Amino acid sequence: MFSKKPHGDVKKSTQKVLDTKKDALTRLKHLRIVIENAESIDLKQFFDQHFSHIYYVFFENFVTIEASLKQKGHKSQREELDAILFIFEKILQLLPERIHQRWQFHSIGLILKKLLHTGNSLKIRREGVRLFLLWLQALQDNCSKEQLWMFSCLIPGFSAPQSEYGPRTLDNLINPPLSLQETQVTIEEVTPLVPPQSGDKGQEDLTSYFLEALLKYIVIQVKSLEWKNKENQERGFSFLFSHFKKFYLPYIFPNICKENSLYHPVLDIPQIRPKPHYVMIKKDAETNETIYCTKEPFIQARVIVIRWLVSFWLEPKPHSGPNIPGMEGEVLPKNIQRAAASLVSREESKNDTVDKVDKSAEPEQSHSNTSTLTEREPSSSSLCSIDEEHLTDIEIVRRVFSSKRSNVNFVTEIFRQAFLLPICEAAAMRKVVKVYQEWIQQEEKPLFMQEPEDTAITCSDIPCSETVADHDSAIEDGEKREEENGTSTSEHVRNSSWTKNGSYQEAFHVCEEATEQNIQAGTQAVLQVFIINSSNIFLLEPANEIKNLLDEHTDMCKRILNIYRYMVVQVSMDKKTWEQMLLVLLRVTESVLKMSSQAFLQFQGKKSMTLAGRLAGPLFQTLIVAWIKANLNVYISRELWDDLLSVLSSLTYWEELATEWSLTMETLTKVLARNLYSLDLSDLPLDKLSEQKQKKHKGKGVGHEFQKVSVDKSFSRGWSRDQPGQAPMRQRSATTTGSPGTEKARSIVRQKTVDIDDAQILPRSTRVRHFSQSEDTGNEVFGALHEEQPLPRSSSTSDILEPFTVERAKVNKEDTSPKLPPLNSETGGNSANVPDLMDEFIAERLRSGNASTMTRRGSSPGSLEIPKDLPDILNKQNQMRPVDDPGVPSEWTSPASAGSSDLMSSDSHSDSFSAFQCEGRKFDNFGFGTDIGIPSSADVDLGSGHHQSTEEQEVASLTTLHLDSETSSLNQQAFSAEVATVTGSESASPVHSALGSRSQTPSPSTLSRAHIEQKDLQLDEKLHHSVLQTPDDLEISEFPSECCSVMAGGTLTGWHADVATVMWRRMLGILGDVNAIMDPEIHAQVFDYLCELWQNLAKIRDNLGISADNLTSPSPPVLIPPLRILTPWLFKATMLTDKYKQGKLHAYKLICNTMKRRQDVSPNRDFLTHFYNIMHCGLLHIDQDIVNTIIKHCSPQFFSLGLPGATMLIMDFIIAAGRVASSAFLNAPRVEAQVLLGSLVCFPNLYCELPALHPNIPDIAVSQFTDVKELIIKTVLSSARDEPSGPARCVALCSLGIWICEELVHESHHPQIKEALNVICVSLKFTNKTVAHVACNMLHMLVHYVPRLQIHQPQSPLKIIQILIATITHLLPSTEASSYEMDKRLVVSLLLCLLDWIMALPLKTLLQPVHATGAENDKTEKSVLNCIYKVLHGCVYGAQSFSNPKYFPISLSDLASVDYDPFMHLESLKEPEPLHSPDSERSSKLQPVTEVKTQMQQGLISIAARTVITHLVNHLGHYPMSGGPAMLTSQVCENHDNHYSESTELSPELFESPNIQFFVLNNTTLVSCIQIRSEESMPGGGLAAGLVSANSNVRIIVRDLSGKYSWDSAILYGPPIVSGLPEPTSFILSMSDQEKPEEPPTSNECLEDIAVKDGLSLQLRRFRETVPTWSTIREEEDVLDELLQYLGTTSPECLQRTGISLNVPAPQPLCISEKQENDVINAILKQYTEEKEFVEKHFNDLNMKASEQDEPTPQKPQSAFYYCRLLLSILGMNSWDKRRSFHLLKKNEKLLRELRNLDSRQCRETHKIAVFYVAEGQEDKYSILTNIGGSQAYEDFVAGLGWEVNLTNHCGFMGGLQKNRSTGLTTPYFATSTVEVIFHVSTRMPSDSDDSLTKKLRHLGNDEVHIVWSEHTRDYRRGIIPTEFGDVLIVIYPMKNHMFSIQIMKKPEVPFFGPLFDGAIVNGKVLPIMVRSTAINASRALKSLIPLYQNFYEERARYLQTIVQHHLEPTTFEDFAAQVFSPAPYHHFPADADH
């Protein structure tokens, strides 16, 4: 206006101004100089003194300029006008007191009228408005009505005010229409000064233009009036403001409500408002975005007033310069600061218009001076960009607003009006939301938010560059909140402006008495009003069809929800506020989401196109979490809960609700586990035990450790199904699989990996953790990264920061209670004053992933808008997104699509890291930063004792927990610092402190809270987990002195046992009846989640009462989870229509899982009735899927539980299992069906008449069934023939085997036993070798029942042997050609099975002839034994030998009969056959061994057959001998009884002995011949049995494939008294230690000989068994005949034809006819006659008589080897033809070593098996190992396993046990001629010392098969006895009905074995044999996995082969004869002379 020139002498100019002689223009010029150069104080004084001069100068010049303007109107005149108006303004400003007294009233009024004339240009009119407002400010109450009318007309567009003269407009006020007489004086007409010029820019909306000007000038001119009394400045503003309210507000806000008061708020929830009519007005030039508006009157004015009012609360505080990027901390010139401010302002404005700001640029923008004011609308020149010079004006304005209640109410009401705007005005709403956000989040509250009793004194002179708050605490909310003490650069500081100077405070204290002046309403009132008012945004009907507006609406709603969430988590609220919050959330949820089914279907699949679809997830989440949080803090009434129930149950068609509910329940279950059961679900005792075991035994520690750390980081998600280090897609655990419906929903989350930040930024190369995942990332580790660096991230991150975070978690685990910083306006939900861990937990969930830079940036809801077109951008970037994606960050996606119970994004691992935080305590000496110490859950104590009360016990009813729902509410209060100080020791409860408290050292952060920036608007999906968590240091109660929780009517807030229980129960039912859910998919999803929920409850139950140290068993838990609580829903679900099939299947599954567990509390009668009804209907259901589900999930334990009345379902189960077995689908539960059937085979003999539900009638009808057995066996037989699944076929065969044994034991003579045997026998040649092997095992087991078979099925044993022979004959050719070891192993098994059967039958039976049906032409009869040797011959020498009819044993067709069909059709399997070689985990880790295997394979069958042959030759008819079954082979060695050897073992001195020689026979057998002294002194004569014999005996020791045998032989001369001629000499060969075979023990009674019933009397038989002599022969008897009969009886091996005595004539030879036979007889008779005649004729001839000979004198042999040589000669060993097969052995030490080694090898298969006894309540190894006895049933069982042997003298297999009694005195032992089993029985072994316990554990633990007899009510766990072995566990559980349930646990690589299977139920009579057989088969299966494993006979054969190869001595005949004649130089026995 004026160019400033240096005028030194202001005084001169002053004088010239006052010089009246000067002309007006000169005086004006000097006046300007004075104004420009004088100090303001002097200027005020000058004007006061010379006001009339000054006004005169001004007025004169104004008149002049006015005249010249009218004439010329050039630009120069306009500039002069500006200059003179400058003087006018100075007059108004400097002389307010005079103007107030109406000085120059009319003159000034006239000038202003000229300026305000509507004909002027807009610039002049606007200037006029400004000056008019100055004048009015000075006049205040002294103005006239005319001025007020003018004020009311300043803004065009408003209705004219009414007066007595009619409506007043600005025109008629400036030029009043006076009806005067012509003669009267008239006023000069006021005309425009400067009319609009042609180039002037017009304004479209004059109303807005002038309204903005008016509002602006009202404020910025407040302080420009130089009042002597400064209070008048405030009064001036108040005057203008009050009239503005009076004249304009009623039009701008027609529905303004004056009753609304912050002090008596009206808290009625508003109604839904209909959608306004939106009109498109234009398209944005830059973004091409359509802009909409509504045609409501004054809508723009409303927006302007709101924005104007908001600006006072969002203005930057004093001295806070604009943030210029890169210039932080520097002092800049003001002009640069201003430029920067406007630049940033423009930049932001542009960004806002184009789109919402790029997140990475946010830090600069959000700190700038104008950032909060210029949004969306282009910032017009002046309105909101008020610079810092005017901040003082703003302070005054703010003071006025805060001066009295009416003004505070005005602000509140205008903000309410903002929430009522249409959504096209969202920008204004955002500002109001921002204001509320700051009010709520900042520490320093506005005065009216302070509590009424607060003094609110705050320091007013803190320099702004200092810390935000240096330990000065503002008292707020009745709590002391400690300020954070981090420093920060000045541009980040927001100092409070409403408590800045002392006078301001004092002013309030002065007026405090008056109610109007007492404006402190308290935080709660503001929160309540905000909650109510902000709900209007939700309650506006959305414009779903207009995408831009929908985006805006969504954004606004999310901003509000973010604040709600912040309040829920961080703000302390009273009961009323909580109730208000809940009511509003309820109403909002209901209003937004409730829609008709038609409307809902219309948007199905297009949810993102509607507001409801976009908000469903966040709304449900916020509502549920707020509800839980409220219950933790205050008592919530029953009515409110009922409302919640009615609302949520009416919204179940939202999938998001189901998912949110499931997440809530999942976390609540963790809370319940922690608070009620003291378990951490992510760190369960059983998991720990198995992990320790894995680390200890398997060497997998390192990898596992890492996994564990990764998982354990998050308590809330500790059992997430994958490790965070992997890809972001989470996998579901094997234990829980989702239904198709939910898997689809869950899979969506996998695609939602684009987050809000990375859409516009960089390609996603690196991925950074969301800050919600780990609260401590902004620490020194990452501090070096530049703050603005943009880093994209994904919402399902599995981030690069993970390892660091884990480390930080470890470091900070002690820092459980740092004070979190308060959130200022930019601070987000990331870090906040977290009242306790639960809040932190919610906060965690409220915010998933809000940081996009690696420095610690917070994320406050609201400091940033989401770009409106974000969905489009996202869709462009990620075409794979699902169609229903709302296009907002994944945290906003519907929970159903953003993760569910099964599929978690990886951030779920850390989503509740902070779950262990509690409220910041008051630590005086520490300043806390923003990083939060996060202990990993592995470090959390479990110290939370049981809160046990009667109401928490489970009772036997449908509802298992009784808690009064009236008193149920959960609470976890935001603990104040004071409270926290009281309990700061962390010994919150006695229980907890006893477990050890935790250090509380805080870890200060390197970043202050000022760095925490809002990055985006995410509502965290993890909200739940935060709400629901329990801190480890606020475990039970923070107030030990107080008694009960808020919920129970007490004062304790937070989680407690009762709270967790009631909350869990209520939330479980909050969806109402889940069966009322209409959408089948959602219904299925809910039931799928119920299955998972139940699994967690079951997991809790399984982990209760677990011994931690494995040394003591804890007592049974007092509280147990209510596992049956879900059954009413499940029962009802089964009755739904087929539309809900998936849900029904889940329900059936869960019913079965629930009821097949051991029931802690027995179900009551009503329950069981209902349950059985449902099972009855389900098992007979027409839908096979339902049947399959029940069978799958009931098997195998259903019948083993002994539920009362469970047998009522037997018929149903048999029918259903039969249906499954006969169905064509391979994926049906076939194995389960067979297991169920197999578990029933022993039942019919127990229940002869079984009452059961009738399966053919759907109604309930009980019938008595006697044909259950037939039905079961029919089904099992059918399955054993036709079952297409291999494993199921194996189980069916095992069931058949068990059933046959059961029937034999019960002597039922069941006709189908033969058919069952037929099926088993036919299965021997089945193509699948696993099945054939199982069949072979069944036959093997039946060997133990041979005696019973012989009685009840006398033909069967022989038939089985014949079938085995024929089957081997049938299989051998193909097996020899096969390259698969499995094929060969099968034939070997069949050979060994055949051997056992042969040994089990008496010789008579084996010698019976085979009646072949197929060979009529073959008249020769072969005995069974003959066929056996033929088939063995074929196996040794190859199947080609069968081509010779002489060597062919028997064919299958020969065996066909009525009882046996050898070619019965068996259906082949429909699944791939398993690999022939059972390569397991063990065998697969081998070095290449294929060549060795091939050699072994080739000889497998041959060597097995040779073993069988030698075994039969040695033992058939002999075993067991007098030494008992434990003695199979001789213990005698060459040094025993040898007078030439004094050594106790084989030693080289034997080679010097002349009485011993070593031979090899047939290259397979080692023979030692020793000559020893006879035993004359023995009673009965010893070996010679009293007969005359030589003085030396011969001992032959034979070592062959089947063992070592010793035979002693003596030469017999005759009876003791010789009468007549001497008897011819003969040799008797007998066994060394016994005279004749003795009967075996009773267990081998099958070996007893059965007498031949040939009609002879007993006497006659006895007679036959004595040697016939002349004295005993009667006259009519023939001596030779009797002798032949005697020989046949006593030595049956001498019989030429089996069973036919030697004295019976041979049958007629085939080649001789009857005539020829008669001729021969006649010839013989003729010769007899001739001889008789000759004797009679020549009897007395002398030459026919001979003299009597004397007996020769015996000669004593001189050779020590004489008798051996003699015996060898008699046996023909010295003959030429034997020369090739009889050789000498080299005598050397190696031979002795080899012999000793050979003798140490086992000659039978050996097994050692552990047996444990577990008594009731025993859960640890110590209790189990110290049992010294068991129940009677157990002892009977152990007795049945074998017979008790005395270990001190036991000569059989010892299995490592000691003879010195250190491992016990006796133990059960079982043996046959082929197998030895010793049982390591824990109760038989001493446990009286630690050493004996260790020894006991070593013996038992090293066994690979464990038999466990458990009488405990809980299932036995594998890890109780810690061992690396124990690969197979056979657990026996006695049942109430005296049957026994079998559980088999085996490692996965172990192949199938029988006869018992997992789930079998057997009778006590067959139990011991079954278990023993199963254990032996399990042991064999385990050995089959050992690489290069050799059977005992293979090993022995190899040793023999080695000895023969290396030690056979080839010799000439002469050398051989010499060595046989004299093995060594002869020398005398020491005592030889006596002989």
Curated annotation (Swiss-Prot):
It comes from the Eukaryota. The modification Phosphothreonine is found at T753, T777, T1001. InterPro entries: ARM-type_fold, Rap/Ran-GAP_sf, Rap/Ran_GAP_dom, RGPA/RALGAPB_N, Tuberin/Ral-act_asu. It holds the Pfam family Rap_GAP. The keyword Nucleus applies. Gene3D superfamilies: Rap/Ran-GAP (3.40.50.11210). Catalytic subunit of the heterodimeric RalGAP1 complex which acts as a GTPase activator for the Ras-like small GTPases RALA and RALB. May interact with the HLH region of TCF3/isoform E12. This is Ral GTPase-activating protein subunit alpha-1. The gene is Ralgapa1.
